[in-house]
């Protein structure tokens, strides 16, 4: 299952293999957890948004479930996590890549990802709208609008 903000994103998610899409606008976490998991919650919640979505992830996970987050850059009350026995994994790939001590282990992984992308086995989701580097403010506004489906690309 994946949560999306509109039908266009739901279609894209299904094209990528999601077996169920949940339009979260106007639907509470409790509502979709009850509907799709018989009120048990999800074993694993993968959060790529962060912010308030991380709090929603705590709510969507089952007791003793796992949350994986790649975008946590804010402060959160972890009480719901502790009271439900959740495990939280926060991954900051940029920090790992930027650390010179990790270059020996990161380089082969990035090369493998590049190979998979070149062979068509890994298909990055890139939004149709691209921006020139001079238009970075417009690109950021577009990103913040929630409209993009995939990554927003800046070009020189």
Where are the predicted features?
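Adenosine-nucleotide cofactor-binding segment
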Residues: 1-52
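Helix-to-beta-strand junctions that scaffold the AdoMet/dcAdoMet cofactor pocket
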Residues: 61-62
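Terminal peptide-recognition signature
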Residues: 13, 45, 57, 113, ...
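Glycine-centered, small-residue-biased loops immediately flanking beta-strands
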Residues: 65
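C-terminal capping/lid region of NAD(P)-dependent oxidoreductase domains
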Residues: 119-125, 137-156
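C-terminal substrate-binding/catalytic core of Rossmann-like NAD(P)-dependent dehydrogenases/reductases
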Residues: 80-128
